[in-house]
Amino acid sequence: MLPSMLPPKSLRAVRIAVWLLALVPFLRLVVLGATDRYGANPLEFVTRSTGTWTLVLLCCTLAVTPLRRLTGMNWLIRIRRMLGLYTFFYGTLHFLIWLLVDRGLDPASMVKDIAKRPFITVGFAAFVLMIPLAATSTNAMVRRLGGRRWQWLHRLVYVTGVLGILHYWWHKAGKHDFAEVSIYAAVMAVLLGLRVWWVWRGARQGAIAGGAVPLRD
């Protein structure tokens, strides 16, 4: 039987392990950069790498609740904030690479790039939505906003997930290469679909308990 909670020492060890594992992609980029091993197109390499890890960690963050509900491992909730902050970290790197390196902080160049490649607008929107999520991730902000308002705000992560997939899909559409993004889209669909199912089932059970006549299946 899977443990619902972990002893403090075990939980601390898990959190440290997750922290280190999530840091590995960044350290890899640093090492590859220091040894001049980014390949023929360094900008494309670091942009793709940071974007990929943003999406991977976003999926991991969204997977915490389904895994907790399906396995009963309630201790998983203790690593969700860390995963979310790492998602924001890699998303920030991804954005800054485009802003500082690709566009050189040139407003005219940025506007032109957005007009030419609208998928960048979608990616920027996803990044902007992550900012309030990261800013309100502390316990102090939960208390300040109140649990219910905090939960409503953090539902923006679902919109961020959809926009992230759309950003990647739109980018790959120009190359007609949908193999990898289709995997992420399928994972995201499952993670969000489970939530929709649980909400629908809860509402249906509530209606039955209240004496309403359910619709036929």
Curated annotation (Swiss-Prot):
In Gene Ontology terms, what is one molecular function of this protein?
metal ion binding
Q: How does it sit in the membrane?
A: Multi-pass membrane protein
* Residue ranges of the TM segments: 82-102, 118-138, 150-170, 180-200
* Cofactor(s) needed: FMN; heme b
GO cellular component term of the entry, any: plasma membrane
Primary localisation category? membrane
How is the cofactor bound, in the record's words?
Binds 1 FMN per subunit.
Q: Which UniProt keywords apply?
A: Cell inner membrane, Cell membrane, Electron transport, Flavoprotein, FMN, Heme, Iron, Membrane, Metal-binding, Transmembrane, Transmembrane helix, Transport
Keyword Signal assigned? no
One annotated GO biological process: protein repair
The cellular location(s) given in this protein's UniProt record come to: Cell inner membrane
Database matches in Pfam families:
Ferric_reduct
Q: What PANTHER family would the database entry show?
A: PROTEIN-METHIONINE-SULFOXIDE REDUCTASE HEME-BINDING SUBUNIT MSRQ
Q: Would you identify the family this protein belongs to, as annotated?
A: Belongs to the MsrQ family.
The task this protein performs is described as: Part of the MsrPQ system that repairs oxidized periplasmic proteins containing methionine sulfoxide residues (Met-O), using respiratory chain electrons. Thus protects these proteins from oxidative-stress damage caused by reactive species of oxygen and chlorine generated by the host defense mechanisms. MsrPQ is essential for the maintenance of envelope integrity under bleach stress, rescuing a wide series of structurally unrelated periplasmic proteins from methionine oxidation.
Q: How does it assemble?
A: Heterodimer of a catalytic subunit (MsrP) and a heme-binding subunit (MsrQ).
Q: What is this protein called?
A: Protein-methionine-sulfoxide reductase heme-binding subunit MsrQ
Organism listed in the record? Ralstonia nicotianae (strain ATCC BAA-1114 / GMI1000) (Ralstonia solanacearum)
Q: What is the lineage of its organism?
A: Bacteria, Pseudomonadati, Pseudomonadota, Betaproteobacteria, Burkholderiales
